[in-house]
Regions:
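Conserved DEDDh/DEDDy metal-dependent 3′-5′ exonuclease domain
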Residues: 13, 20-119
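Short beta-strand micro-motifs in enzyme catalytic cores
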Residues: 3, 15-17
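Acidic, Mg2+-coordinating catalytic module of metal-dependent nucleases/exonucleases
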Residues: 87-183, 190, 194, 266
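Conserved pre-motif I regulatory segment
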Residues: 242-275
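Interdomain "pre-motor" coupling segment immediately N-terminal to P-loop NTPase/helicase cores
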Residues: 186-255
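Two-metal-ion RNase H-like nuclease active-site motif
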Residues: 1-10
């Protein structure tokens, strides 16, 4: 059974002043007592909330082997396109009533339900990419466990440890949207979360969609990953030829076939290519 939680913390004492929780069975708790909160949550195996990994779990000190689902980390992955989810503004929940942890718990429940719907609307290949990138992380692993998702792989493949062909897997979903010769294996190994968030934005197909500020604060390498995927030309693939080639851009945006030459030097072309 899952329980949705939220806490109000006194900024001076750094202690919980108010606990709110709502269980899957409909039971609701609003209390100042940690003992009451612990007893209420103990009947569940999964704990969910918004930003509970970096906030609520630190103050509640829950004891037990709970599966943790944090709707904060899921939101940029599953709602990358404008308009963003109505319940989320940057890293905060949009709530109707301030300082009401029960209300916030209910909002977290609603958000998780919408995130599950959004997950089910992804293509099977995109689901597989996100899962293989993120299932081993604390931020996302609990979500996959809760929805009982695992990427299909044969028993023989698991036994012999077949390695994922990341270039093939990603390009199957994002062909024409990223450089075909990007170092996917390196990105997967060093920046799995950053890569997932980058692919979410790329897959949104909306040039005005942006990565939330809190993501950039916590995962600043997202900028570097995006540059490696979309703004670093290999000079030898369809994406780079169409999107990053200076002559193609000149023709597409201005209708000219060649850059002007000044004293035998293509200064305009050099300026574009060095930008």
């Amino acid at each position: 059974m899952i329980v949705f939680i939220d806490t109000e913390v006194n900024p001076q004492t750094k202690k919980v002043a108010d606990y709110g929780a709502m269980r899957e069975d409909g039971a609701v708790l609003h209390s100042h007592s940690k003992a009451d909160f612990d007893a209420f949550v103990s009947r569940c195996d999964t704990v969910c909330g918004h930003n509970i990994i970096n906030h609520d779990l630190k103050y509640t000190a829950l004891r037990g082997n709970y599966t943790v689902v944090d709707t904060l980390f899921l939101s940029p992955l599953l709602f990358p396109q404008r308009p963003y989810h109505r319940l989320v503004k940057d890293d905060k929940l949009q709530v109707d009533e301030l300082n009401n942890p029960v209300n916030d718990s209910m909002k977290a429940r609603d958000l998780l339900n919408d995130e599950i719907v959004a997950w089910n609307q992804l293509t099977p290949n995109r689901q597989k990419i996100y899962y293989l990138l993120l299932y081993g992380t604390f931020e996302f692993g609990g979500f996959f466990k809760y929805i009982r998702y695992s990427a299909n792989q044969s028993l023989l493949g698991r036994i012999v440890g077949v390695q994922t062909d990341w270039a093939q897997l990603i390009l199957k979903e994002y062909e024409g949207k990223v450089c075909s010769h990007a170092n996917f294996d390196m990105l997967v190994k060093q920046y799995p979360i950053e890569l997932a968030y980058s692919l979410a934005i790329i897959g949104a197909d909306d040039i005005f969609s942006i990565t939330p500020a809190w993501v950039l604060r916590n995962y600043p390498q997202v900028v570097n990953v995006m540059n490696l995927l979309c703004n670093t030309s290999c000079g030898d693939c369809g994406y780079c030829h169409q999107r990053l080639d200076a002559h193609c851009g000149l023709k597409e945006f201005f209708g000219y076939d060649e850059f002007r030459i000044f004293d035998g030097v293509p200064m305009q072309q050099q300026a574009v290519e060095s930008a």
